Amino acid sequence: MGKVIVQDFTCKEPITMIGTEAGVCWGADISDQKKNYRRGIDCLESEHGRTFEFPDTYMILDGYSARVIREWYTHIGGSPTRLQASTRYIDYEHGFDYVVPPSIEKDEAASAGYKKVMTILQNALTALDAFGIPREDTALLLPLGMTTRIVCKHNARNLMDMSHQRMCSRAYHEYRKLFDDVCNALRAYSEEWAYLVDHYFMPKCEYMGFCKEKKSCGKMPHKE
């Protein structure tokens, strides 16, 4: 499956940054980093959401399906920025990589049929390329199951909001896996990101203590 790479441009001390920027607003002394950290914790606990928009993450998402990346793009709160690998530069000679969903992979006949279709598409793309058809046109044959690669920038508030929706047990399984990978990569990046992930990146039912979804999985009760 795919992997998440947190780039070095990412702020290593997001909580301290939140507290520092909030301190400017409050006319506080921002020369003491310990006080800035505590102020950042206060902002988080008080849900002063605007301050969460200061720390940015820069990540490479590599090896996930074009389908799940398309869904990743739909969550645009906080003005994220992203660039995706161009379909013009796919190596048709060696073919494209693709994702096989677990429900298909566990069935031998279904898996064989799925892979056969991918091979047919790869052969068709190679043939069209030989005819001199521009790749911007042949790319219309590329499937959503093809893996792709993007680089993206998101602030902490945007990622928290995404986690509440996309870590839900009813979310698309590859998206849940992708977000788990994001959480693990950020945990490994710094202690302050680990704190944010462990305390604020979770399904909204866990964050709120009740479920707001009409079609609940039953994990949490609906709000009375």
Sequence positions of predicted segments:
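Family-specific signature for flavin-dependent thymidylate synthase
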Residues: 1-224
